[in-house]
Amino acid sequence: EANVWYLERLHLGKHRIDESKSLISISFMEVKEIQNREILQAYMKYELGITGQAVSTIVRRFVCIRNFIELLGQEKILAIHATVAEVKKYADGLRERGIQAKGFNERIFGIGHFYKFMEVKQYITRMPFRIEYFQQKEVIVHHDRSVEETVYMEILKKLYLFPERLRCMFLHLWCLGLRASEVCTLKGNAYYQQGEDYWIQVYQVKMKNYKRIPIPQALYQIMKVYLKK
């Protein structure tokens, strides 16, 4: 079994891949113990082949699991022999690092998901710990990421100094309120005219669907000129 999996060779559906992210491969080389590595590879075959989740979600969970297995390896412990004590030690390490509740829970749930897989596949007879025992209470915080008017007006004044590609990207962010990741994955055929209205079609990775957004005529004309070059 290869210890590095290249995503382009896995023939995954395009709707599962966020093209704005630079993820190229998945590495198992960090897991030195052979049995631990083989079980982790079996788990990733299930995740990538069966679940249909976004690759970025799967890989984020994979990294948490791999980090935990690496810690087990340092103690010469097989993943199938891990107990609640090892999970507690891992959780204590997260707290010492100041990991917030959301990130903490994501890591613990990821490890729990891995052990539930092992239970179903009969690598182990039962889960060695209860996720609920470690789960932290999450306090939802609203992050105001809006840009002050003085800032974006200053950018607009100096926009002519930027390369054309960056000018176009900024206009999409400013005019349409798109996410940066959405702007980075726009295709040339995303722009079209319908009657007297102008539209852009944007793919949403999380929703696994396209959304249509009305755009100013000026932006449509700018992009038509840019795309002809």
Regions found by a protein language model. Give the residues of each.
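Hydrophobic (often cysteine-bearing) scaffold residues that line and stabilize catalytic clefts
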Residues: 61, 107, 165-166, 215
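Short helix-capping and inter-helix turn/linker motifs at the boundaries of alpha-helical repeat units
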Residues: 34, 81-82, 145-146, 159-162, ...
